[in-house]
Regions:
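Conserved C-terminal alpha-helix-loop-beta "cap" of PLP-dependent enzymes
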Residues: 77-87, 91-188
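Active-site C-terminal subdomain of aminotransferase-like
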Residues: 3-104, 185-189
Length: 189
């Protein structure tokens, strides 16, 4: 969602606990300290990074939306039907599209990884993942592991080979990633 990345790609930790009040309280006691709960939590000596993340978050979300719109335009040019389309309202940073073949999905994800600032040398391969019935491929060369605001993509290896693309800390680098991914998926020869 557009309110998802309050850390702006800078905060080294974060997360959400949701549920019934008494269960959230139990989680807070378990994750922080008994008796302190959510009132006083661990900050890992990083409040500066968290505040800076809050400060940068609106701009980072704009970069991710620009990346999504750019990707949607480019995908339409190569005959794909992204959801949402570039001309539609955006209430999320995720773009999904049917890659068409397993090779195209793998190529797209490998292109995103190759253009990433971290672990660009790695070539993701489909593998079994807990909770999925099919193999899944994931690409994310992120500064913060598990970050959803940094450029990443993934998808299950089954027809119609739907790819989920999201994020982008800055448009310039993300545009290069999307270009390389499309080239790798559809213009490899």
């Amino acid at each position: 969602s557009l309110t998802n990345p309050p850390g702006g790609g800078i905060a080294p930790t974060g997360g959400y606990i949701v549920g019934r009040k008494e269960l959230v309280e139990l989680c807070a006691y378990r994750l922080n300290a008994p008796g302190l709960g959510k009132e006083l939590g661990c900050t890992l000596e990083t409040p500066r990074d968290m505040y800076l993340g809050f400060y940068y978050a609106p701009g980072v979300v704009c970069e991710a939306i620009k990346t999504a719109i750019y990707a949607q335009c480019l995908l339409e040019l190569v005959g794909k039907k992204p959801i949402p389309r570039y001309c539609e309202d955006h209430n999320d940073i995720v773009t999904c599209f049917d890659a068409g073949t397993a090779e195209a999905l793998i190529g797209f994800c490998q292109g995103i990884q190759a253009a990433s600032p971290v672990d660009s040398y790695a070539a993701p391969e489909p593998s079994p993942e807990p909770g999925y019935t099919d193999e899944v491929i994931m690409a994310s060369g992120s500064f913060t592991q598990g970050s959803t605001i940094e450029l990443s993509c993934d998808g299950p290896l089954r027809e119609p080979y739907t790819c989920y693309l999201q994020g982008g800390l800055n448009f310039a680098a993300s545009r290069a990633g999307v270009l390389l991914a499309v080239q790798n998926a559809y213009f490899k020869d």
